[in-house]
Amino acid sequence: YFLLIPSQLKRFIELVFEKRAKKYFRNKYTVSLSTSLRFYDHTAHNYLHGICDDLNMRYWTDYSADMQDLMDETQREKLLVFAEEFFHAVASRLPTTKVYDPVVTRRFTYKAGDVKEKVDNNGRRILILTDLEKEKSNLGRMIDQFKNSFTDGVEIANINDIEIKGGCIGCVQCGLDNKCIYMGKDGFIDFCEETYFTADAVVFAPEIKDRYFSWKWKQFLDRNFYRGHTPGLKGKQTAYILSGPLKQLENLRQIIQAKSEMGYTNLVDIVTDESENDKAIDRTLYNAARRMMWCDERQYVKPPSFLYVGGHKIFRDLVWSRRAIFQADYKYYRKHKMFDFPQKDKKAAAFNKQMMSLMKDPKMKEEIRKMMKTQAVRPHMEVVAKE
């Protein structure tokens, strides 16, 4: 469940707050346990920890297991030790440490100004995807202001208008050929294939609920897994328009950035109303529109960070080792040469073999040690000199 928890559990958490049921959780000891491939398991645990702190629970710790750990005796023993410590903490009423402060929301009404000079769409189809419930809200007004920044406007799609029968159930049947169990039973896949993935640029404008977005938004993202680990928006420009305290939700910011990088998209900006300054919000919305078209014209996607590189290696190894299950992913990875295992780098292998052979001689090893700094930058200096 990409970067967080299943939408079904997210719905439960929202109901706890909606039904004012926090009192039933107060001072209860708790842990969070996950089984996954350890792909952004930390963001899921961070979210749950924050929610437990909001509920004034006694959060002890988290436990992140691989999906196959139960089959390993050593890992089973480790799980028992984890449980033993937790039960001891409960029985002994040991103190716990709160990590997350309550999220503070402010009352500010954004009033959009006039757009004096509009950004040329250049014939590109821009889609704003939202789950907006109240049009006369800050988020609604920000969406309108962004839309009015373009010469030809933008298309707006509300996921609440999409027929979605249910959330992803994690059956992984789609791994074989990208065929979801809901196929033909609701309108989700048709929307994705005909509207969402065909857009030239996408702006996400979800409503912030507790420490993430809404459960409906998470349901939409979870259902996207029918494509497995193959990207649907590769090479496209994306941006976020948010109303709420993003500066207090660093975990959510990392989730947004990770989703963008793992989707091979270029995240232009995340625009919020936190400045509580109408003109500043107008400027950032307009600048996001301008940058989106500027980057689109140049087909620019910024280089990935650890958020992608680490995630890619996990997915690469998963698809390779379980290609009998993820057949559709395997075909995509193979076609796009994404099985970039280091042992396949013949040039690096030849270099390492030669250098290790040379350094068996102690004198040569010392000579190479002296040259390491200058030789490391020499090829780069040659490129700079040519430019």
What are these regions (language model features)?
Residues 1-18, 81, 87, 96-227, ...:
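N-terminal beta1-alpha1-beta2 submodule of the flavodoxin-like/Rossmannoid cofactor-binding fold
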Residues 1-58, 183-263:
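Helix-loop-strand module that forms the ligand-binding subsite of alpha/beta enzymes
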Residues 9-18, 22-106, 140, 144, ...:
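Extended, hydrophobic interaction surfaces within ordered domains
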